[in-house]
Amino acid sequence: MAALLGRDLLSLADLTPTELQELLQLATQLKSQQLKLRCNKVLGLLFSKASTRTRVSFTVAMYQLGGQVIDLNPNVTQVSRGEPVQDTARVLERYLDVLAIRTFEQQELATFAEYAKIPVINALTDLEHPCQILADLLTVQECFDSISGLTLTYVGDGNNVANSLMLGCALAGMNVRIATPSGYEPNPQVVAQAQAIADGKTEILLTNDPDLATKGASVLYTDVWASMGQEAEADDRFPIFQPYQISEQLLSLAEPNAIVLHCLPAHRGEEITEEVIEGSQSRVWQQAENRLHVQKALLASILGAE
C-alpha cells in the first residue's frame, strides 16, 4: 500500500474509504499467509497506559515482519522528568523507524507526530483507538458476506472506542448507532467528523435507548463503563450504566445472526454477561486475534515492507 508509506495514523479520519478497504484486504492476506512481507525496521512502543493486547500484538507483528521492537517505558525515560515532548520526538526519530504511542491526551500524540519525522501510530488515547477498530472491522468483514450497509450498535460509555467506531463505520459504509446514558455521549467533534465522512449515505444515530439502538443490528458492541484513568468513578457509574449491559435479553433484539464484540478487558456481569461473552454469537476472541493481523498490515504499509 504505497498510499500509506511514511504516514502517521493518529485517527481513522486520516484514512480514505479506499485506503481502509486496502488495509483490511492486506490484513486478510497476511492472516491467511497468502502473502509474506519483510522489513528490517525498528518499532518503538511508548506506552503511558497499561496494555495487554496492543503491546503484545504490535510486538509480535513487528517480529513476524522481521523487524525489532524497543519497549520504551515512560517512567524510566526522561519524559517522566519533564523533558519536552518535542525534544523526545526529535531524538527518537534518529533511532527508530516508527513509533506507536499510547497516552492520555490526543494533543500529546499530535505533538509527537509534528516533531518526529518518522511515522507515529495512535495505540490509544482518551479520544480515539483506531487500531482496535481496524480489528473490529476485519472481524465483521470475516463474519458477513458484505460489510457495507450493515448496522453496528455500540452500548455503554461514549469513550475513545465509540468515537473511533463512528469514524470507522462511516468509512466502511456501515450504519452505526451509539446508545449511552445522558451526559456520556461521544465527543461532539468526532460525531461531526463521522457525519461528514458518511455524507448522508449511512446512518449515525445517537440515543439514550439501548433497546431502540439494538433492534435489527448485525453487530452488538460494548466496552468497560469506566476507562483507564476513570477508576475512581466506577462505583458511581455502575447504576447509571446498568441498563446498558449486553445481556441475552438485549441481544435477542438484534438480528438472529448478529455477532457480539468487546474490545477487552471485559468486566463480566457489568457491561456484558458471562452467558453472552461465552455464547455462540460472541466473536470476542477472533476480534482480539485480529489486532495482530491489522497492525501487521498497518506496519507493513507504513514501512514499505516487501
From Swiss-Prot:
Entry annotated with the keyword Amino-acid biosynthesis:
yes
Membrane-crossing segments per the record: none
**So where does carbamoyl phosphate get bound?**
S51, T52, R53, T54, Q78, R102, H129, P130, C131, Q132, C263, L264, R291
Q: Enumerate the catalysed reactions.
A: carbamoyl phosphate + L-ornithine = L-citrulline + phosphate + H(+)
Q: Which UniProt keywords apply?
A: Amino-acid biosynthesis, Arginine biosynthesis, Cytoplasm, Transferase
Q: Name one GO cellular component term.
A: cytoplasm
Q: Where is it mainly found?
A: cytoplasm
Gene3D superfamilies per the record? Aspartate/ornithine carbamoyltransferase (3.40.50.1370)
Residue positions annotated to bind L-ornithine are N160, D223, S227, M228
Kindly list the biological process annotations in GO that this record carries: arginine biosynthetic process via ornithine; citrulline biosynthetic process; L-arginine biosynthetic process
Q: What EC number(s) does its UniProt record assign?
A: 2.1.3.3
Location in the cell reads: Cytoplasm
Q: Which family does it belong to?
A: Belongs to the aspartate/ornithine carbamoyltransferase superfamily. OTCase family.
Function noted in UniProt: Reversibly catalyzes the transfer of the carbamoyl group from carbamoyl phosphate (CP) to the N(epsilon) atom of ornithine (ORN) to produce L-citrulline.
Q: What is this protein called?
A: Ornithine carbamoyltransferase
Q: Which organism is it from?
A: Nostoc sp. (strain PCC 7120 / SAG 25.82 / UTEX 2576)
Q: What is the lineage of its organism?
A: Bacteria, Bacillati, Cyanobacteriota, Cyanophyceae, Nostocales
